[in-house]
Amino acid sequence: MANIKISTSLGDITVRLYDDTPIHRDNFLKLASGGYYNGTLFHRVIRDFMIQGGDPDSKGAPAGKQLGVGGPDYTLQAEIKPHLFHKRGALCAARLGDEVNPNRESSGSQFYIVWGSVYNPSQLKQMEKQMKQNQVAVTFNDLVSYHKEEIMNMRRNRNRAGLQAMQEQLLKEAEDICKANPAGFTEEQVQAYTTVGGTPHLDGQYTVFGEVTDGLDVVEKIQGVKTLRGDRPCDDVKVIAMTVEA
């Protein structure tokens, strides 16, 4: 596993990159060692949530400039792994939303580090319930898309009985699929979210490709800075340099 020291204007953060996400690991190593991030800002900071950086357009950006859309001319294939989750200190890849990015491909350069909150078990159970409902809905919509032509033919022929039967069939299929592989939190996730904290609602949505091993106090300091509209810090928080360590 590679380690990278992120030297910022508020202190140093060391992250370890996971070997389980080789596409993101190799890309981050390439950009960091090539000086790509030097001089960029943590342009989006939300207290009790996360700090985001990696936009090359943030280098020397004047106050008030809207940031967050810059990056290289490529995206990265998602490497979303169930055992890599959004605990406090997780290093993750930013991306565009599902409506324009259904495959959840990552930004070529933008990343965020999780701060989040500590949850109690009842909060996680409620969240888990919502996750299961969402899982059924997403699976049902996927099945509808798969049977789109058949459904369109029924609509053209005004076959209401057939449409009703198809809906019931696909809903049952979706429920059966989800029962076989239910959404929820592992013991490791529950332990992390009820002790150190994090952002559990992002699990399964974004690629987590590393974690902070030193300098979590610096992350805390950055996530607590005052911000302007658009979540940009009032006073720039700059990445001075990134150094690849053994």
Pin down the residues of each PLM region.
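Cyclophilin-like peptidyl-prolyl cis-trans isomerases
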Residues: 1-246
